[in-house]
């Protein structure tokens, strides 16, 4: 295994270079802006390339030493991609809504996860002794908990690294990571504050093709970390149940 390759052309085809309207920018992003076209800021991909490469290395290194990566993206166009990418790389995700205290009040979250597991047991069996209405209420409770916590139910504690799409929308998640000293990899669009992020990646955080490309690369970096961890522990990768790798870079670029 090796870190995933990507090219400037793939970034261009995915629209990574398109920022927001110039009047919406955050002046702190000035070092990462190439210029503007039709009142839209153009992000400097010559900086994105090395910063993305560094972020991929951090993800791989974190997983290689047994760390957990939490993918966070709750906006409509990121939600499904975030979940799929995290699952494919045996990591964790929040893609519905960030609940306040999700990291800083882990004990309460753990109790809710235990409740989710209990509901799975109850509803997975015959669920005897419940009326139809009671069972329906339990199913609704389970569905609500699974939507909020399903992606972190097996995380077993706070993550070692967070990967975030849209730092403005996920500000609470970033604040909690800062309080706990959890490093953050994130896409920073032209309207974001890069100072909040440990490993920023300048790029479009709205276009679904761009989001798919980032998530594919981060996912494959995590898979590389798994392979390195197994290799260093002397495990036979051929005999182990490998995490499936999907060669979707081209597909992601095409949307």
From Swiss-Prot:
Keywords: Ribonucleoprotein, Ribosomal protein
Keyword Protein biosynthesis: no
CDD domains xref list: RPS2 (cd01425)
Residue ranges of the region described as Disordered: 230-255
Keyword Ribosomal protein included in the entry's annotation: yes
SUPFAM superfamilies: Ribosomal protein S2
InterPro entries: Ribosomal_uS2, Ribosomal_uS2_bac/mit/plastid, Ribosomal_uS2_CS, Ribosomal_uS2_flav_dom_sf
A single cellular component GO annotation: cytosolic small ribosomal subunit
A GO BP entry: translation
NCBIfam families xrefs: rpsB_bact (TIGR01011)
Cited HAMAP family: Ribosomal_uS2_B
Family: Belongs to the universal ribosomal protein uS2 family.
Name of the featured protein: Small ribosomal subunit protein uS2
Record organism: Rhizobium etli (strain CIAT 652)
């Amino acid at each position: 295994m090796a870190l995933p390759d990507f090219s400037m052309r793939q970034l261009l085809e995915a629209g990574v270079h398109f920022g927001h309207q110039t009047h919406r920018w955050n002046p702190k992003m000035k070092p990462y802006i190439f210029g503007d076209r039709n009142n839209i800021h153009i992000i400097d991909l010559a900086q994105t390339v090395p910063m993305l490469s560094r972020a991929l290395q951090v993800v791989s290194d974190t997983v290689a030493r047994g760390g957990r990566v939490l993918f966070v993206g709750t906006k409509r166009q990121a939600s499904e991609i975030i979940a799929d990418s995290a699952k494919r790389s045996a990591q964790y995700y929040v893609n519905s809504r960030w609940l306040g205290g999700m990291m800083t009040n882990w004990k309460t979250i753990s109790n809710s996860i235990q409740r989710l597991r209990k509901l799975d047991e109850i509803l997975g069996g015959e669920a005897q002794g419940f009326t139809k209405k009671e069972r329906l209420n339990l199913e609704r409770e389970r569905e609500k908990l699974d939507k909020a916590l399903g992606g972190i139910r097996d995380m077993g504690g706070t993550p070692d690294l967070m990967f975030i799409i849209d730092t403005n929308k996920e500000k609470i998640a970033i604040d909690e990571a800062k309080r706990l000293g959890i490093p953050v990899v994130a896409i920073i669009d032209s309207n974001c504050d890069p100072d909040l992020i440990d490993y920023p990646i300048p790029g479009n955080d709205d276009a679904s093709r761009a989001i798919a490309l980032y998530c594919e690369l981060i996912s494959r970096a995590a898979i590389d970390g798994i392979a390195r961890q197994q290799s260093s522990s002397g495990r036979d990768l051929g005999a182990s149940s490998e995490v499936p790798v999907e060669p979707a870079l081209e597909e992601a670029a095409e949307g």
